[in-house]
Amino acid sequence: HRVDRRQRQMCIRDRYNHMYIPRDFGDPQQNFWNLVNAATLSDVAVERQVEITGPDAATFVQMLTPRNLSTCAVGQCKYVLITNAEGGVLNDPILLRLAENHFWLSLADSDILLWAQGLAFNSGLDVQICEPDVSPLQLQGPRSGEIMQSVFGDKINELRYYWFAEFELDGIPLIISRTGWSSELGYELYLRDGSRGDESVSYTHLTLPTIYSV
């Protein structure tokens, strides 16, 4: 259903991380100028999360990356490299610390879930590793701040770069972070209720473009 609807919106799809991704809507050059001058909204549900919980979660997450995470606070994001035993880079996710022993790795294209589960098996650490039902959107561009304020109110302006907070949109639980793939102002919106995710996508695709020419 979701792919068909995006096809009707002139979407070009591709495969990424074992999933279909709506890669492009219309003219690529116009999409670029929308990003630079206004804002672009991207369905990046292909960026899956690896959830790590348990009494030893913080210790285990530090095992995955050479970056020192000792100063990573609850509510903070970190850009990290996941490396193998030889120091080769397996992935470069955004790490979100949701609680003292509750982490997400927001991934690019690789099977880090399987890598982390394999590493945990003989680690001797008490951790649980799974893929939560979480699908992100990215809103990027210089007008993304005013768009987010119009939807979520002034609280969104309190978000610092590489920090996140919990929000709701029509009863749909979200985590919103001040992060993103572009060099412009931007946000990532993590939908935490897969059964209602299409409602939120419909809202942002149909309402925000009318107001802001997204």
Locations of regions flagged by a protein language model:
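Single conserved hydrophobic/aromatic residue that forms the stacking wall/gate
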Residues: 1-8, 12, 205-214
